[in-house]
Each structure stands twice: as C-alpha cells, then as structure tokens.
Amino acid sequence: MEYEITDQRREYLNARGFTILTACPGSGKTTSIVYKLKTLIEECRINNSNGTGVLCMSFTNKACEEISSKYKEMHGRSIDYPNEVRTIDSFITQYVVLRYWYLIEGLSKPIIINEDEILHNLFFHKYNGGEYLPYALREYNDLAHSYKPEKVEYIGHNIFKIENTIVSKDNDIRLFNYCNAILHYRLTHGALKSSDAMLVASNILKKHFVVAQSLANRFPYVILDEAQDTSYHQFEILELLKDAGLSNLELVGDVNQSVYEWRNARPEIFQQYNEKEEWNHLILMENRRSVQRIIDFYSRLKPIGYPNIVSYGVDDANIQIEIIRYDNGQERMAFDRFCEICEGYNLKSRLVLVRGKTDLTKLAAFRTSIKPWKSEIPYRIIDAELLFVQNKIKEALEKMGWICAYLIYGDGHFSEMKNYLKERGNTIEFNIMLLKLLKSMPPLSLSFNRWDESMRLLLRNGLNITEDLDFKFKQRMKGYNMNRLRNQSVDTYFGQVEENVVTAQTIHSAKGASVDAVLLYLHDRSGAQVISFNDLPDNSNGLAEIKEKHRLIYVACSRAKQLLTIAIPSTITENQIRRKLNGLDFHISSRGVQMVLNL
C-alpha cells in the first residue's frame, strides 16, 4: 500500500504530546493513523519499559478491524502485544470496569448488556398476561410503561436521558427519582449498559488515582479515532488518564461527521479542544475521494471558520450534481433516473440514503435473488446477520433463536422446538448466547466457501453440536458456474451495498462508506425526524450553528466520489432550487412530474 506524505500529513506524523487532528471526509485519516502507528510502536519499544504499548481506539468493531487489516497490509505484520486496537467501550470495560468493579461499594460483578430486549426482561416480571416491575421498584409501575427502564441513561451532571426526554431534578423530581432507582437497580444487579460502565469507570479512576496511573503507564501513546462521537464520560476518562501522566494523546475526527448524539456523542466537547492552548491543532483537508463540485455542495454545511476542503488527485468524470424532482408516491421514479445516470457513466458502487428507518419502507430494495444452498438455514442466518447490522436486535434474536432450535432438534420436531424456545427464550443466558453468535458471525465479505465453512464451525462450537452440519451448497444452478460462485463474496448477492445493485439504507449505517454515486432523499417540509430541502443553507458562508441534521446531510453527500443526486418532492419548484443552490454546478430533472411550477 502506497502512502503519499504531503505537508499536512507530515505535520501530523511528526506530532507528539497532545494533538487534535481535524480530518475532512476522504482525507485518508485511517491510513495516516496506520502509517504513524508503526513509528509510535517502535518509539514506545525503545523509550519505555517492557509491557508498555500503543493503544489505538475507535468506536466500532468494524473500524477497529479496518485499522488492524490496513496495518497488516501496509507494514506486513499484525499489531501485537503489548500494543492494542480496541473500541473505546471495550478498552474502558476490560481495563477498568471488569478489573476494578469491586472498588465501587454496592456494585455487583458486572456484565455489559446493550440489548434492550434483555434489559427489559431484567426489569419486568410477567404475571397473568401483564408485566410488572420487581418489588424494589413497584412504586414506579405507572412510569415504567411510558418511560421504559431499559431506555434510562445517565449522561452526567445529575441528568438522565430516556430516548428524547431529558430528565433532571428541576424539571420532574419524581421522574428523576425513578431514573435514579433504575440506575441503582442495574448497578446492584451488575447488569450494566455501556453508558453505566462509563460512569462506573469514571468513578473508579476519580477515587483511585493509582488505577489511572497504571493505565497511563501501560499505554503511554493513545490514539482515539472518530473522536467527535465521544461521550461526556469517555472524555472525562481520557482527561483523568492525562492527569495521571499520559504523555501522548491524539484525538482524530471531524465535528461535521458526528451523527451519534442519540448515542450520547458530545461533538461540542470535541470542538472545545480546538480552543485549548496545550494541544497541537492540525488539519487534513486534502480529500482523495470526491470531486470538487460535490465538496462544494456539502461544504455549505460546515461551521464558519472551518478550513476549506480541496479535492486532491481525484479524476473528474465531469458529472453535474443531479437534483431530481418527483411527485408524491413516485419515489421509484427518482431511483430509476439515478440508476440511468449511473449506467451512462459506468458508476458501479452506489448508495441510496434516507434519514431514518420510517423512510426505508417507502423505497423498494432491488437485488439479484439467488439460492445457492438447498438448506434454508444459511438464508435465515444471513437475514439475522443483516437485521443485527441494522440494529434490529429483537428481530435478529428471534430469528437466531429459531435457527438454534432447528439445528438442535431438526425437521419434524416443531413441538420440541417450541417448548425449547418457550423455556429459554426470555432468559438472559440464552439471549447472551445468541448475541455472542451474532457478534461472532463471519463477515459477508468472505467467499461463499469460506463463509459456509466458518459459519458451520461457529454453530457447532456455539451450540455444542457433535454432528457435522451441511448447508448443501448446490452442484448445479442455471446460469451460474458453481465453482466460480463458490469463490465470490456472499455480499455480492446478499449484502447491504452491492456492485450494480442498490438497497436503501439509513445515513448512520453508511458512515465510513465510499462509493461512486449517492442518491439522497430529502423531504419538502421540516420535521423533528426528517431532513428536508429547508435544511440546506442558502449560501457558502458556513453555518453559525451546525445541528445534527446538517451533519447527517454532510455525511451522506460526502460518501460520493463522482455523482451526487438529491431527490426532492415536486412541491419544491425549480426556481426555489436555483435560488437555494446558487453558485453550485447542478442540473434539475423534472421528468415525469405532472405539474412543473416555476414560482
């Protein structure tokens, strides 16, 4: 893997101490981190005692796997002990909470449970067809069904959040006491959400300086990628490590790409680090993904004073931004027009993006349907895996439960399967086992051969099945060379984003993607849970206040390399579009619209 060292990159590679790196979309920040890691690992080996290493963190397992695989590709070896690549949740949980939980009075030995369905069963007891809180919480039965206990999260400063409701002593004392009781119940039973674990870790490090000091000594170099998605308590933990002697800390991210405020991300705290004098403030503003006209479009959504982003080394196919107007109920027309443009320019990889899951129901998914296995099991497994990736945890667990019961009992034993699921389906142990299977599933990027083999091995080990499993891959299938198909990746036919095939997905699920073409659906009216044409700025001066809706559009548009297409209802007139997008290079398509008003 080649890595070009420009002036901006060189400045980052040479930086030590406390560094804030603001990296635009397509800047190659992950590649830069990977390049720098080798140098830091060598420095750490020379300058520090045995057993100390570099810690590189990000927010998802997928991001960590990307860092690890790129490191091996670039440097010819894996990152090994004493160096680590982990999610920030995993690091804090493993190195602080699970090691030192006993230092917190009243806390039971914890397990981390982020699945609402399992936490729900911890709180609610079923009786006579109803659900009731345990005796210790019975006084809050009236609140529990409106404000589900599994949704209660402590976010700092004596403030709780229940989905979109903020709760404090000042605005509702009884609801605040309910939240406190729920948190206390989780802690005393050792069933912690990730946000609970961050709170526990913060308290451990505050009260026991020696623990923070030992971690600062163990990892004298720390890099946090996607730092804009860090929560209040995670920032607090990093500061506690810094106070305990951590000498090298890098926060790498882009405040414009923070789209996880609903998961307690605090992008404004990340932004505040740019005002701290003891930190190095560096930038990567060379975009190696998108052509300049696309950059100019989404740059309108960045804050005032944010550095200019420049397309760097990208071949331009000279495709205008396409604004497609469609009549209500004719979303498919916009999709067809998008595909037509892509075919004309031979753009293979594509994304169709919407704000949320409710919009997905309006858009059909188009994929090539094949059935290479005789058994139904692998198709159900893939369905479960895709549901899990889409954060549809309950549906994924239900599907995996059925799969496990079937594999244990086989055909013709429906009553045994039903009893098995009835007895175990609501137990924490069974659901944790299912989650472990879902989290350990081989990626759909593997070939059919490798995925089939890896999945059968996982199921045999996970379910303690002694017999060999056989999904019965077909020997013949009309129109396909089966030997060639065996070596193709599963996600060519079953994945979220496929070559020449497009399925609609949410912007959140596409974060980190890089494709030839993007189609983004916007609404014509503003609303709490939608992004609309009205959310686009009228000029390129930058925004005084950047909101999550702006960041969502920014992230969606910045996935595109050559073609950006915006689909909007025909209630938005062509003249409104021209006024809004004045100064940008775009084309309006109103083909098929019943009435074109130019007001």
PLM features: what roles do these ranges have?
Residues E2-P25, W279-E286, I304-L353:
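Inter-lobe coupling/hinge region of RecA-like P-loop helicase motors
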Residues A517, H523-L599:
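C-terminal accessory regions
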Residues D229, H233-F270:
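Signature of the SF2 helicase/ATPase Hel1-core->accessory helical subdomain module
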Residues E105-R186, G412-R460:
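Coupling/switch/interface segments within P-loop NTPase motor domains and analogous charged loops
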Residues G329-K474:
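Conserved helicase/translocase motor-coupling segment
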Residues M1-L103, Q213, Q505, A510, ...:
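P-loop NTPase Walker
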Residues Q257-R263, Q271-Y312:
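Conserved coupling/interface region of RecA-like P-loop/ASCE motor cores
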Residues M1-P25, T31-S32, G53, N128-P220, ...:
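Accessory N-terminal region flanking or inserted into the helicase ATPase core
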